[in-house]
Structures are given as C-alpha cells and as structure tokens.
C-alpha cells in the first residue's frame, strides 16, 4: 500500500502519535522521524532552523528509504507548515503527494493566536526564557491548550518533558520559534497550494484549541474550495492525544473515500 508519511513532528512528536501509531500501521506503511531540533534528534545551538530545511529532510528520508510511490501526509502543528511546503513542491513536481490531512496548526498566519510563552520566545529575551523553561512551565502551557475535559496526566507530561529535555532542547526553543514569522513570509505560496484542489485535503481540528481551533477552521472554509473539515467540539490543540479514536475514525474514513470513483473525479 501507499505510505503514510507523518510530517507532523514537533517538540513532543513521539508522544503525539503514540496512540495512533499501531492502528495506522495495521493499515498502512507509516514513516515518521523526529525533525531536526525536536524529540531525540540533534539540536545544534548555532543553527538557523527553517521549515524549508525540514521539508528537505523529510524528502531526504523518503529517498533514503527508497519510497518512490505517492505519499499521504498526516500533519500536526509545526508539521502542518512542513506539509504545506511539501504540498507546494508537489505542484512543482518535486515530490508526489497523494493526500494530506492537517490536524490543529497555523495554516493561516492571520488566524494563528500564539500563547504567551510563544510571544516571549519571539522577543529579544527569548533565549533567556528557553534556558529557564521547566516542566512546570510545560504543564502550565498544556493546561491552556488542551480541552477542559481532557487535561494531560502527570505521566503524559513526564513523557513530553523528557523529549523537550533530550539533547538540551530548552536552549534552542527561541531558535525553533522562528517558524512563526516564516509562516507569514510563505503564506501566499502555501495557501495557493492548498487552493489548487488537485490533492485531496482534510482538516481534523480540536475546536477548543485557543491557538488554531474553530476560528482557524472558519478561515479554512472561507479560502479553500470544497473544504473538507471535521471539528471535534470538546477537544483542544492535541486531538491525536485527546481523542485518538475520533482522529483515527475520521482519518481512515478520508482514506477510504479516496478509493471511490466520485472522489477521484472530484480531485482530477
């Protein structure tokens, strides 16, 4: 079967996809990596982190694994932007994308509402905040962006924090946050790619996410022709953790629909 390439790596990537990995792997070949600067990957301090470089690395991984067939992208958060760049490259015939599903993420700079920690990391003093960032700070941030009925357990927070800490991660948080202005600079390219309509797209979004929740989906419906969206009403920023069964259901439904003749005709 065609591969599912997860372009969804972010600071907490591995824990993000823990609940979906085995169910997806039963149906598809699943490929994912910790992106540069995230999880257990290298986190060089003297490095300019770029979404374009992250897309390059995803393509390099596919080439290394000998994956030549079209890939299906499943992305979240930071990974949404990487997936948008890969989608734009599809239309430049630099990669073959079969479909793309976005979970909560900043698809449009005008609807992205950064939390206080992100704003501070973007400031000239961001490097100081990164070096003092703690598990307590992580827990506070997560409680703001999870749905009120789906607060993360202490065990989940421990797992997330271990990935942030890996390879001295807090010292580069101010470097990684550069994706926010980079999104603004590449908005036209990425939104235009989503509007082309030749690659099937779906958004599965936790509506209560204060960063990229229902307000982002409303904008998506305004800008994207024949918008295919699923709003999860009581869910926050991490639907794959807060409601993994719902995400799996809506993702597999999307993939099944791609096999129908009417779906192929609509996207041809």
Please describe what each predicted stretch is:
Residues 19-28, 64:
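A short, Lys/Arg-enriched amphipathic alpha-helix followed by its capping loop at the start of a domain
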Residues 10, 15-16, 31, 38-74, ...:
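Flexible "cap/lid" subdomain of the alpha/beta-hydrolase fold that forms the substrate-access gate
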Residues 1-8, 12:
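Single conserved hydrophobic/aromatic residue that forms the stacking wall/gate
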Residues 259-268:
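Alpha/beta-hydrolase-fold serine-hydrolase catalytic core, especially in secreted/extracellular enzymes
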Residues 5, 18, 25, 248:
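Conserved catalytic core of two-component sensor histidine kinases
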Residues 232-248:
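Catalytic histidine-centered segment of alpha/beta-hydrolase-like enzymes
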